[in-house]
């Protein structure tokens, strides 16, 4: 039995013969080992642990050695020799030679004293030499010493008028010039509905024709949203209306035939 157990352990898995074979209607069971499994496991681990070789760099003698600081008689009191079994000793360089090597690439006055008072005074920032930059948080409050390089409003190119609508533009300019004295008179009378500067620009087209509308355009801030337009029909649906806003967000200042 003992010989059979050793043979079962040493033979490769492909050449092992089952000690016991059992089968039924569902499966076939092959038994390759029979005995105390703990003894086999202990033998396996004891054999594996006995083959371990300790490396030379991890021997107890090398581990017991510590770091040593030596100060020979030929060296100055400020110089110490560092020796360790884990690192390779570097060639020793005196402190004075190290300072000379570090200052080789620096000019003479700078090597003596790199932090002189004259350099500190030169590096100080004068009040008149403050940097100017624009604050992105807000445009209304400006701190002293800072200025905005750009105006608050965006620079948007004005739409170019079409040559076919020049008569309509001239008509609107004439109405705008006529609305200015009416605006001043309305302010004196206290009528807010006739003030063009505060509420908008009122276009009075010829009332005799039934194909015209009274257009009221409010002056809002230029934005991507549609402008506030109020169309009040007088008699029948008109033939003229305002064109939609262009791609810059500003409404066209002329009429377009429907």
Swiss-Prot record:
It holds the Pfam family Vg_Tdu. Residues 55-93 are annotated as: Disordered. Belongs to the vestigial family. One of its GO terms (cellular component) is nucleus. Keywords: Nucleus, Transcription, Transcription regulation. GO terms for molecular function: transcription coactivator activity. It comes from the Eukaryota. May act as a specific coactivator for the mammalian TEFs. Transmembrane segments: none annotated. It is found in: Nucleus. Interacts with TEFs. SMART domains: TDU. Residues 55-65, 74-87 have a biased composition (Polar residues). This is Transcription cofactor vestigial-like protein 1. InterPro entries: TDU_repeat, Vg_fam. One of its GO terms (biological process) is regulation of transcription by RNA polymerase II.
């Amino acid at each position: 039995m003992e010989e059979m157990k050793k043979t079962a352990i040493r033979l490769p898995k492909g050449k092992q013969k089952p000690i016991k074979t059992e089968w039924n209607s569902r499966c076939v069971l092959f038994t390759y080992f029979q005995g105390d499994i703990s003894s086999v496991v202990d033998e396996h681990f004891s054999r594996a642990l006995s083959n371990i070789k300790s490396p030379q760099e991890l021997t107890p003698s090398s581990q017991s050695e510590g770091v040593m600081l030596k100060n020979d008689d030929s060296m100055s009191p400020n110089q110490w020799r560092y020796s360790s079994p884990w690192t390779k000793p570097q060639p020793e360089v005196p402190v004075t030679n190290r300072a000379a090597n570090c200052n080789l690439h620096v000019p003479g006055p700078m090597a003596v004293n790199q932090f002189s008072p004259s350099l500190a005074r030169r590096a100080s920032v004068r009040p008149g030499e403050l940097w100017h930059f624009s604050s992105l948080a807000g445009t209304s409050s400006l701190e002293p010493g800072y200025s905005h390089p750009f105006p608050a409003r965006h620079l948007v190119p004005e739409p170019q008028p079409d040559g076919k609508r020049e008569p309509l533009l001239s008509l609107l300019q004439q109405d705008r010039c006529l609305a200015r004295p009416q605006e001043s008179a309305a302010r004196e009378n206290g009528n807010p509905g006739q003030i063009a500067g505060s509420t908008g620009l009122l276009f009075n087209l010829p009332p005799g024709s039934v194909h015209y509308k009274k257009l009221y355009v409010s002056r809002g801030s230029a934005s991507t949203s549609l402008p506030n337009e109020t169309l009040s029909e007088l008699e029948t649906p008109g033939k003229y209306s305002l064109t939609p806003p262009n791609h810059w967000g500003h409404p066209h200042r002329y009429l377009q035939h429907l």
